[in-house]
A protein has these predicted regions:
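Conserved micro-motifs of the catalytic ATP-binding
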Residues: 25-29, 61-64
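Conserved catalytic submotifs in the C-terminal HATPase_c
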Residues: 53-67, 92-95
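A residue-level detector for a conserved hydrophobic packing site
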Residues: 69-73
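Short conserved segment of the HATPase_c
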Residues: 109-122
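Short alpha-helical Gxxx[C/S/T] motif in the catalytic ATP-binding
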Residues: 138, 142
Length: 171
């Protein structure tokens, strides 16, 4: 019982720290013009994972809060790697939007849960494997970041069999 209680306290502490870190960064960071393609490419290289395939259109600039966008993309990639092995990442610029898509080959999320996964502290346990390290904030924070930039985030079934997360950002 003591071990379980200790794990629960550690998980609660992790939840609070993640949320506080997110809350403090949203109020202090200013918009800047940056090369989102290069930023994302640098981020993905840090994962050092040969099972992440990239299709990145070069030289896409975006005016926004760079650190928050990195946090947003990291959260989605972390989720994809937690539940899947293969991850497919793409970024492209269309006429008025930047589209970022992250797909994985994991168990996916039931369509009935799509809206719920954006709720803070919500976790899906059925069929998603062990979620001990999950606090249920990753996609919630990603959604908040995207919406704060005037964008939208959508979930679908991935062609790889798992989840596809599509982020659309205006520019």
């Amino acid at each position: 019982i003591s071990n379980k209680l200790s794990e629960d306290i550690d998980e609660m502490e992790k939840m609070l720290n993640e949320y506080l870190q997110f809350a403090s960064s949203t109020s202090s960071e200013k918009d800047e013009l940056f090369d989102i393609s290069k930023t994302i490419e640098t981020l993905i290289k840090k994962y050092n994972n040969s099972l992440i395939t990239l299709n990145i259109e070069k030289n896409i600039t975006f005016n926004g809060r760079k650190n928050l966008m990195v946090r947003c993309i990291s959260n989605v990639i972390d989720n994809a790697l937690k539940y899947g092995k293969k991850v497919k990442f793409s970024i492209k610029k269309l006429s008025k939007i930047i589209v970022i898509t992250i797909e994985d080959d994991g168990p996916g999320v039931p369509k009935s849960e799509y809206g719920n996964v954006f709720k803070p502290f919500y976790k899906i346990n059925k069929g998603r494997g062990d979620s001990k390290s999950s606090v249920g904030l990753g996609l919630s924070i990603a959604s908040d970041v995207v919406r704060s930039h005037g964008g939208k985030i959508d979930l679908n079934k991935s062609k790889l069999g798992g989840l596809s997360v599509k982020i659309s950002l205006p520019f």
